[in-house]
Amino acid sequence: MAKLSTPLYLICLAFIFTRDVSANDYRQASSVYIVYMGTLPEIKYSPPSHHLSILQKLVGTIAASHLLVRSYKRSFNGFAANLSQAESQKLQNMKEVVSVFPSKSHELTTTRSWDFVGFGEKARRESVKESDVIVGVIDSGIWPESESFDDEGFGPPPKKWKGSCKGGLKFACNNKLIGARFYNKFADSARDEEGHGTHTASTAAGNAVQAASFYGLAQGTARGGVPSARIAAYKVCFNRCNDVDILAAFDDAIADGVDVISISISADYVSNLLNASVAIGSFHAMMRGIITAGSAGNNGPDQGSVANVSPWMITVAASGTDRQFIDRVVLGNGKALTGISVNTFNLNGTKFPIVYGQNVSRNCSQAQAGYCSSGCVDSELVKGKIVLCDDFLGYREAYLAGAIGVIVQNTLLPDSAFVVPFPASSLGFEDYKSIKSYIESAEPPQAEILRTEEIVDREAPYVPSFSSRGPSFVIQNLLKPDVSAPGLEILAAFSPVASPSSFLNPEDKRSVRYSVMSGTSMACPHVAGVAAYVKSFHPDWSPSAIKSAIMTTATPMNLKKNPEQEFAYGSGQINPTKASDPGLVYEVETEDYLKMLCAEGFDSTTLTTTSGQNVTCSERTEVKDLNYPTMTTFVSSLDPFNVTFKRTVTNVGFPNSTYKASVVPLQPELQISIEPEILRFGFLEEKKSFVVTISGKELKDGSFVSSSVVWSDGSHSVRSPIVAYSIQP
């Protein structure tokens, strides 16, 4: 993305600061706060006027108009304003205010991926109904001219569409890309200058485009999960993604009439769901029948790192496919080592001198020089040479110094190949150590880095190390992430003005139409695409029914490659075709979530304002008893446990059907009983309840045990993971 020059940036900041201070000289230093006020009143009401009057009472008439940043007025009630901490606390004490929290900034977290999850081009589709489904993508914008968003063969937008094309300068929508908006006052367009939003939008709902590739790698037909669906793009990310803009995008997307929201943005840890923009936005989306898919985050493999943990949204971990990118390093002595990267460059059989970072630095300590830290690589000493760096981020410094190539030790992301701007490879510890030994002993040491090739990864699927893990420390007794989806080395549409190796080097000037990216950001739109696919078959299904269908039909993964098991992959890897016909679903209504929030400590007044419903909190639902498709409980590591889960399923399969329960796999540490063990249905939409009781001896501190309940009628298999854990923050 193009950046403001430093002088202009400072001028803009100076202007903002001057404006705020001059508006009210006695005010303390201020920040942007979000004042969330719940649902919009049903009476005749002007949100901006009301918001301004609140500020006028707080700071006076003259200052108020300068402090108001944005009003949320289409789908829920609230505003953003420049406030001091003391002023924010005064607003928090107002009866009509649910929460006040600072607007933070957050990070943005295919030819083969859909085939790998059993969702080929010939999968059963309802193309006419699919074209009525609208996927809203909250991200870094979109490149409207991409073939993935061409509207050939599309009719006019669905009648339910209430949005518009406000993409800015030189930006045109069409019958495929039916809407666009942007939310930063320094921007002039919804056009994607980072590539991220274009990539995610095309993964969810892009057209089928033949012969797509990244310089010949991953060649094939690139397509989204629902190629016939429509797309609306909401640009909230401009290097970073601010809460104030994220909420504005939700406000618009809900009112515009989207059916599914994909948001590949991982919010920082929050202790209160009503202080989190994605949680608030997705709650109001759920109330309007819209399902939100959100990325689990890229802070793995640490326990408890999972983000976007609201129970009303579907939280997506990343998994790999059976396609892996590797490259080989051939040393002067003929020894070949295997590394990983997406390296499209060819050295044509020529071996170049290879030097260690410590030997080509004049200004740094030995440790920093070995890492190839910023400013440590001497350009005069690396010209025409390959540099060996102890740190993954040495890529950029070697490139900027003018080296012919780089080899790095990859302990940061050992299972993820990233696009590199010149010949490069990342090696595991043992192979890297052998190169260091070779440099010390050979005279002269030489090497060649070969172009990346594709191989079959027979251990897939597995969750890569970067994908955030559970358990959730925000809401105990709720399994997060919910599911996993392909998010490793995914090819999809890209912005031609963005650097394809921006993660490592924004100076990479290559222009591409399709690129390879990794992250839970890439996994999230896969699930949004599946949700849209299920919606095309069942347009009247609730968000919880669609979510249940995706979760209970997911495939459990290889335990040897995924030692964290459900805390890594949730219910398992998505199976789109099965999700369209799940047999049974677990449904959760708004009032059920509110009862759960009561049990989590929220009071009746707060929840009444939030939902617009009359909430008394006389009835509370423990999180473990929320009618969720998984069953999870925290247990003390000091005592044996005995826990009961109550669940209700709705028949959406055959009218006359009988389901029998089984426990898979049987675990000696976990005793499970199900009552009743048989459910008989006589008609569609009939509901049946059952109780699952688990017991066991005390778990070791920081451990867990898991199994699953599977209901089967011979045609459908409805699987619900069960997890007991003693992991604490």
Swiss-Prot record:
Residues 1-23 form the signal peptide. Pfam families: fn3_6, Inhibitor_I9, Peptidase_S8. Residues 113-580 form the Peptidase S8 domain. It is an enzyme of class 3 (hydrolase). GO terms for biological process: proteolysis; response to cadmium ion. The keyword Secreted applies. Transmembrane segments: none annotated. It is found in: Secreted. Glycans are attached at residues 82, 275, 348, 359, 363, 614, 642, 656. The C-terminal propeptide is autocleaved. InterPro entries: Peptidase_S8/S53_dom, Peptidase_S8/S53_dom_sf, Peptidase_S8_Ser-AS, Peptidase_S8_subtilisin-rel, Peptidases_S8_3, S8pro/Inhibitor_I9, S8pro/Inhibitor_I9_sf, SBT. Residues 32-108 form the Inhibitor I9 domain. Keywords: Autocatalytic cleavage, Glycoprotein, Hydrolase, Protease, Secreted, Serine protease, Signal, Zymogen. Residues 350-436 form the PA domain. GO terms for cellular component: extracellular region. Belongs to the peptidase S8 family. This is Subtilisin-like protease SBT4.3. The lineage of its organism: Eukaryota, Viridiplantae, Streptophyta, Embryophyta, Tracheophyta. The gene is SBT4.3.
